[in-house]
Amino acid sequence: MAGNTIGQLFRVTTFGESHGLALGCIVDGVPPGISLTEADLQHDLDRRRPGTSRYTTQRREPDQVKILSGVFEGVTTGTSIGLLIENTDQRSQDYSAIKDVFRPGHADYTYEQKYGLRDYRGGGRSSARETAMRVAAGAIAKKYLAEKFGIEIRGCLTQMGDIPLEIKDWSQVEQNPFFCPDPDKIEALDELMRALKKEGDSIGAKVTVVASGVPAGLGEPVFDRLDADIAHALMSINAVKGVEIGDGFDVVALRGSQNRDEITKDGFQSNHAGGILGGISSGQQIIAHMALKPTSSITVPGRTINRFGEEVEMITKGRHDPCVGIRAVPIAEAMLAIVLMDHLLRQRAQNADVKTDIPRW
């Protein structure tokens, strides 16, 4: 299986399956001399891990990360950092009934068409359980970006179903189970989730991630544009079906006079572009949004076929999220951090000596 690595200078390679013994990753390109402990990674893992809310899957995994290599006496050595998280709460018997059945809306059918077999236990490699290692690797990037460049990366839920959420108060995001920045909408989200659990159904969501303090100049035209790499990283997250940078698809209804971000001596007067122009960061906030589909792991009966081509009725068993968008927030933050870390190292490698007199804000 190819496609398990992201990045060029800051490279993250993950391995493991949902019901395997463990998940792991190798992180290459981490500069030496960075203070790093398992506790530095655990905070974001705790934000992502299952079983922490009545609105997410009740699979209870502690997700305790172990640093296996690349750190000596609490400091990175510049060599490959190996990370491992053991799986402790697998219930593979929940999936025995789908050994020969393809769950509609899942990767069962396509994995078997591609490889001729599949690990049917919780989706195997296609499960969102894999993203735990992305979050661990992303936490390394977030720490480096914050300490060396003052870059802050934050994410939040900005829509669930037909309930739009305004970014009113970032401090509220960690104070509720929805990563919601709009305290006036938490009750409505709660009611929607209770209704979905009662119906055995699910709902889609929109997640927004913002990076502040990113310097101008990151991005490698033409094929490794910063926005292209961000879109690639976010689209690689399970259930993501669309990505927008800045105003995204809303620009369709705008005129050029409205959409352009005018510049004065005081700086940019707007940020419709989401902090990226010509594939290169402008120094403004980088803003990206991603749309996540409603999970197909629901108890509402649906039609499908088995591997023998026979039509059968499917009712999903097991422990699942009514809205996968909730736990996607720390994953989106991690993927944005990984991309920015990679591009900062690439910029430093090629253009460290470049100096300009152009104003920066």
UniProtKB/Swiss-Prot annotation:
Free-text cofactor note: Reduced FMN (FMNH(2)).
Pathway the protein contributes to: Metabolic intermediate biosynthesis; chorismate biosynthesis; chorismate from D-erythrose 4-phosphate and phosphoenolpyruvate: step 7/7
Annotated keywords: Amino-acid biosynthesis, Aromatic amino acid biosynthesis, FAD, Flavoprotein, FMN, Lyase, NADP
Catalytic activity: 5-O-(1-carboxyvinyl)-3-phosphoshikimate = chorismate + phosphate
Keyword NADP tagged: yes
GO biological processes: amino acid biosynthetic process; aromatic amino acid family biosynthetic process; chorismate biosynthetic process
Annotated binding of NADP(+), by residue: R48, R54
EC number, UniProt record: 4.2.3.5
Listed GO MF terms: chorismate synthase activity; FMN binding
InterPro entries: Chorismate_synth, Chorismate_synth_AroC_sf, Chorismate_synthase_CS
Cofactors: FMNH2
Residues involved in FMN binding: R125, S126, S127, N238, A239, G278, K293, P294, T295, S296, S297, R319
Alphabetical list of PROSITE patterns matching this protein: CHORISMATE_SYNTHASE_1 (PS00787), CHORISMATE_SYNTHASE_2 (PS00788), CHORISMATE_SYNTHASE_3 (PS00789)
First-level EC class: lyase
Keyword Magnesium among record annotations: no
GO CC, alphabetical: cytosol
Quaternary structure (record): Homotetramer.
Annotated function: This reaction introduces a second double bond into the aromatic ring system.
Membership in a protein family: Belongs to the chorismate synthase family.
Protein name: Chorismate synthase
Source species: Escherichia fergusonii (strain ATCC 35469 / DSM 13698 / CCUG 18766 / IAM 14443 / JCM 21226 / LMG 7866 / NBRC 102419 / NCTC 12128 / CDC 0568-73)
Lineage, opening ranks: Bacteria, Pseudomonadati, Pseudomonadota, Gammaproteobacteria, Enterobacterales
